[in-house]
Amino acid sequence: FAMLNASGCNIGNFAMPFAQGFLGPVGVIAVSLFDCGNSMICLGGAYSIASIVKSGDGKFRIKPILNNLVHSIPLMTYIFMTILGLLHLSLPAPVVEFAGIVGNANAFMAMLMIGVGFHLNGDPSQIGDIIKILGVRYIIGIALALAAYFILPLPLEYRQALVIVFLAPVASANPPFTAQMGSDFGLASAINSVSIIASIVLITTALVIML
């Protein structure tokens, strides 16, 4: 459960708007490049590994991981569009227009799903789990953000973009994958919601300092 719900970064619904608003085209490119690897984790990678760990047989098998990745429609769509981009091909205008209409509902549907699933029963252990999982997540995230900003020999805009993505909330796909794995969907939604609030504070503070 912790492995799945501490992984991934919410790029499209969260980090990208910050990059567009404050960092401009270079920041958007940097965030998009980061999301190429991030999507592999968010859209099936973390779920596959967490499922293997939950099974408890102690055997690491690559076939189930690849099987889950291949059957992940969002990931396959992402890869398909990346290939089209590399080949300098584009979809017909009506398809792009329709996809844009559907895509505009993505953020709303993600937040609706998290809101519907949000459930805390008042058990102190749940609060403890949230603090423990997000504590580890943000300690690592802050350390990576500091390292990226002060150590990496990259242009300033790229380092600023990395700070944003490392401080981003956990992936919005985590709760449905948690439910699919048979774990606590309500707690996963609560972790996701709290991480959004924490990331707003952290990223806003970071932008004030960096800009």
Question: Which ranges hold each PLM region?
Answer:
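Alpha-helical transmembrane segments of multi-pass small-molecule/ion transporters
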Residues: 1-211
